[in-house]
Amino acid sequence: GIDFSKFASYKTAIGTVDGKNYNVPFDSGVTALFIRTDVIGEAGYSIDDFTDITWSKFIELGEDVLAKTGKPLLSAQAGGPDLLIAILRSAGDSMFDEDGNPNFAGNDVVAEAVEDYETMVDKGILVEVNDWDQYIGTINNGTVASVINGCWITSTIQAQEDQSGDWGVTTMPRLDNAPNATNYSNNGGAGWMVMNDSPNKALAIDFLMNTFASSTELYDTI
């Protein structure tokens, strides 16, 4: 069998129903602030200035970086929930309650997150784009000086070889007033499932048991 205790509990919980696990966790979506150290350096800052800070401080720094370099700190897909979800999760909150119902009315954490987002847009610190390709473009072409997303975004950053050595990574900002605010969050991460009517069900289960469910060497390699 598979020893699910070897995985982070939040990864196994999402695939567990009535005490039975239905998936093998794959990657995590640990969220961080990836930032162009060359750009913030031009504005007189280092990565330490952006470490373990609040969103109000991030906005303050963002205004100064924009004024001195002409570069906004962030971009986001207009209407996309990724950044807001990451902010809410950093404070242990969500857009939905445990029953899947909207969790907006009377939710001070949601209100604060939305207010910070709107402030960044209004001040030009965050640039909204139309689609995912444009979002990736703002990172690769140097339109923005940082990105807040799951750790899987590193493949996008590393693909731009001419920016090698220009990026650093640190904690994301935290909400100023939320009681459970932290500088840590998660966005994304996947899992593997075998369909019950798969013609190669036994083979697929055996494959998962001997690869993603047990081999730390495989994870280190990929």
Language-model-derived ranges and their functions:
Residues 80, 132, 149-154, 188-190:
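Beta->alpha turn/N-cap motifs
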Residues 31-35, 88, 192-194:
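Short glycine- and hydrophobic/aromatic-rich loop-to-beta-strand nucleating segment
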Residues 1-32, 59, 168-172:
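Hinge/lid segment of periplasmic solute-binding proteins
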Residues 70-71, 141-150:
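Alpha-to-beta junction loops
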Residues 1-7, 41-44, 143-146, 160-162, ...:
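Extracytoplasmic "Venus flytrap"/periplasmic binding protein-like
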Residues 43, 123-125, 160-222:
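Extracytoplasmic/periplasmic substrate-recognition and gating elements
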Residues 59-64, 100-129, 172:
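Glycine-centered hinge/linker elements that transmit conformational signals in sensory
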Residues 52-59, 127-141:
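Short helix-initiation/N-cap motifs at beta->coil->alpha
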